[in-house]
Structure formats: C-alpha cells, structure tokens
UniProtKB/Swiss-Prot annotation:
PSII is composed of 1 copy each of membrane proteins PsbA, PsbB, PsbC, PsbD, PsbE, PsbF, PsbH, PsbI, PsbJ, PsbK, PsbL, PsbM, PsbT, PsbX, PsbY, PsbZ, Psb30/Ycf12, at least 3 peripheral proteins of the oxygen-evolving complex and a large number of cofactors. It forms dimeric complexes. This is Photosystem II reaction center protein J. GO terms for biological process: photosynthesis. The keyword Transmembrane applies. It is found in: Plastid, Chloroplast thylakoid membrane. It holds the Pfam family PsbJ. The chain crosses the membrane at residues 10-30. GO terms for cellular component: chloroplast thylakoid membrane; photosystem II reaction center. NCBIfam families: PRK02565.1. The keyword Chloroplast applies. Its main location: plastid. One of the components of the core complex of photosystem II (PSII). PSII is a light-driven water:plastoquinone oxidoreductase that uses light energy to abstract electrons from H(2)O, generating O(2) and a proton gradient subsequently used for ATP formation. It consists of a core antenna complex that captures photons, and an electron transfer chain that converts photonic excitation into a charge separation.
Length: 42
C-alpha cells in the first residue's frame, strides 16, 4: 500500500475502484429496473 508520488492527492487506484464500483452499480440498477419493468409482461 505504497502511495509514493501521490502525496496530497487521492491514489489513482482508489479513484478507479470507486468509479468502477459506482458505474457497475448504476448499470446494475438500470438493468434491474428494466428487467422488473419488462419482465412482468414477458
């Protein structure tokens, strides 16, 4: 867990992890919403 060169900044791996998790979560919510909305008629 060496943050050499990232003093005073957020580590890039942390930004990538948070952004990736948020993106996957949002996509999951959208897919789940469309699945529930359309799944009732299928």
């Amino acid at each position: 867990m060496a943050d050499i060169g990232t003093t005073g900044r957020i580590p890039l791996w942390l930004v990538g992890t948070v952004a990736g998790t948020a993106a996957i979560g949002l996509l999951g919510i959208f897919f789940y919403g469309s699945y529930v909305g359309l799944g009732s008629s299928l």
